[in-house]
Amino acid sequence: MNASLGNPEAMIYARSSLKPFQAIASVRNGAELSDERLARAGAPHVGSQRHQDLAAAVLESTGLDESALRCPTAWPQDEPTFFARVREGLDKNQLAFNCSGKHSAFLSACVASGWDQESYLDPSHPLQQAVMDAVVEFSGSPIGNIAIDGCGAPVPQMPLV
């Protein structure tokens, strides 16, 4: 028996649930990530100092730093890290943004593949095309319109099921 409420084939924007596919595309295109760094690439984080250090380490391993990130700045959601930054007179930063792990992995793949790093969030960029290919491969779903997520990354419209 099949049952549903509403339209299970309605097109939605998957947003953060796409992070595993974005991480897969990054690794397939040369991002070398330890298990811990891969976990941060495939899921959001709270901006703890440990999380920021992991994203920074991915960037440093490719010769880049925080200035290469194209995600917004944010205050850490982790309270001890937030209050430490405030006490030190520091402002919000990109490494504290909850998608910085994913963005660091994106940049690692760009460096490994010889792709432009400035435009890594452009929907036509080879890395973003690889992300869309991974989404289609693993979901078996068609992709509709492309929107831009809050972190600046392209996000496809796709059916819920």
What annotation goes with each model-predicted range?
Residues 36-160:
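Active-site-adjacent helix/loop patches that line small-molecule binding or acyl-intermediate pockets
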Residues 3-21, 37-39:
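Short active-site loop at a secondary-structure junction
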